[in-house]
């Protein structure tokens, strides 16, 4: 932490100036960025309201080739129509991989009106030429029976999404590494959902925070975890940090990337201090790994 703060304070001005200086190049190039590293735009949630297009340009100039959205339940993203966001990012050389969203447990009958939510979300995902609708967080499970109902619900969500042209995934936080009646929540959900309909987006930092072994999950559940959130957690100091400075074993994870079926890699920067500089550092850390090359 002290070392990072020292570096960030001494280099922040130069780094951000360099990013800003690349804005013009990013704005006039419609060619896709090289590589396979995306950014969860939740990472820059404080910057987007201040300068939406300018922030996206800075992200593109860092080298990111894709973005993940969030809070599009009303058909827009920070007040911008989704079609406009899609075009804006495409002009910056970036695609959209999917969005975070979510609902509580809905009626078993997928023709019930409550299921219009997931049909609408699927339409929004298609509107931005993306593939994934991702639920982040589980509704108040307190027993194994609750987990059983939740698993059945996720199966139905996956079916509805698939019928509407997108795929469904569940994103874990550290809480899902806890146990209910002796069952690790995340493992129960993976084992008791249908692999045809339900996939998982593993947040690496949250998994380590919860005491989980990311590499074990990739080995034991191949093809079930095609999406990664690249975040980092310093287990010794109990805090989220920049990629490569924490306890997530990324070299070992990327050794398993192909065999585990990794499809989508998005950085999620959990810290809010020097966010743009952190996102640039995260990109530079990940680009050393062979999988990230186009």
For the regions a protein language model found, what residue spans apply to each?
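N-terminal substrate-binding region of glycoside hydrolase catalytic domains
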Residues: 64-78, 100, 134
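Acidic (Asp/Glu)-rich catalytic clusters
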Residues: 31-32, 56-61, 78-97, 117-129, ...
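Active-site acidic/histidine proton-transfer and metal-coordination neighborhood
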Residues: 10-12, 21, 107-200, 276
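Histidine-acidic metal/acid-base catalytic patches
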Residues: 4-19, 25-38, 44-56, 60-62, ...
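Acidic-and-aromatic substrate-binding clefts and catalytic sites of carbohydrate-active enzymes
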Residues: 44-50, 70-81, 104-115, 139-148, ...
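A short, structured active-site edge motif that brings together acidic residues
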Residues: 98-104
